[in-house]
């Protein structure tokens, strides 16, 4: 069974309560339940964490080494400027998939830049909460394609 660390960045815990026109009405708890249900179907064990703190997110990324087979991360606002999170992603050997609920490329100019994406295996953006589900399938695909 593959082990995946899911990291939600700042303010993701308010999904369903804030900017519903951007992030939708589904709640943070509902997103996590969706992730757990789909992961079980794919025979993937998930640990879900959320932090509003850059340092805490970095520590979570570091903790994945030798403990998880992949990371799914929504860096949220840190996507656009956190070189520290980018460096943390680069420092681990496990594949990292960046996800976003909204399409960051269809939003404000500053949101169209992802400094973290360059260190990720791939990016899934704009599919609402299903971005996380698609990322689980990407993890499964990576597993199958490398014979793991």
UniProtKB/Swiss-Prot annotation:
Annotated active site: 23, 100
SUPFAM superfamilies assigned: Type II 3-dehydroquinate dehydratase
A GO term, aspect molecular function: 3-dehydroquinate dehydratase activity
Keywords: Amino-acid biosynthesis, Aromatic amino acid biosynthesis, Lyase
Involved pathway(s): Metabolic intermediate biosynthesis; chorismate biosynthesis; chorismate from D-erythrose 4-phosphate and phosphoenolpyruvate: step 3/7
BP GO annotations: amino acid biosynthetic process; aromatic amino acid family biosynthetic process; chorismate biosynthetic process; quinate catabolic process
Source domain of life: Bacteria
PANTHER family xref list: CATABOLIC 3-DEHYDROQUINASE (PTHR21272:SF3)
Complex formation: Homododecamer.
Protein name, entry field: 3-dehydroquinate dehydratase
Highest classification ranks of the organism: Bacteria, Bacillati, Bacillota, Clostridia, Thermoanaerobacterales
